């Protein structure tokens, strides 16, 4: 009888743990990698102002990569620019903020841009 009670309590704890961990895993943001940079850029309207190899409203991704190629702090600088927006670096037109982009998606796009915005 006592063993059955112990097993029942252990099973209840195990099930509760699975539910809690499962919920935490479902709530965790998906982690994009640099290979997803182009896909993430397209799905977050980046291509409305930027192109890979030519200036549109904003600089081309290749121009950005060239400007920041020797900057050791390029990833955090550009990630902040994507999240918070900014102006004056590439002209008078401001970069709009993208606060709803996940940190993983921002990092993916920034790393992809700094890699020269490859098409694959």
Regions of interest found by a model, annotated:
Residues 1-9:
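N-terminal secretory signal peptides that target proteins for export/translocation
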Residues 26-41, 67-69:
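Electrostatic cytochrome c docking/interface patches
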Residues 42, 66-69, 83-87, 111-118:
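Sec-exported extracytoplasmic/periplasmic mature domains
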Residues 54-66, 81-108:
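Axial heme c-ligation environment in periplasmic c-type cytochrome domains
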Residues 67-77:
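Short microdomains enriched in Cys/His and/or Lys/Arg
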């Amino acid at each position: 009888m006592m063993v059955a009670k112990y097993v029942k309590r252990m099973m209840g704890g195990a099930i509760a743990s699975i539910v809690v961990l499962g919920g935490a895993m479902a709530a965790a943001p998906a982690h994009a990698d640099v290979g997803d940079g182009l896909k993430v850029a397209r799905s977050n309207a980046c291509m409305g102002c930027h192109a890979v190899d030519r200036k549109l409203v904003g600089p081309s991704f290749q121009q950005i990569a060239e400007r920041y190629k020797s900057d050791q702090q390029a990833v955090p600088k550009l990630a902040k620019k994507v999240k918070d927006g900014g102006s004056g670096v590439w002209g008078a037109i401001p970069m709009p903020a993208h606060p709803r982009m996940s940190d993983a998606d921002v990092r993916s796009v920034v790393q992809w841009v700094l890699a020269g915005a490859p098409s694959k």
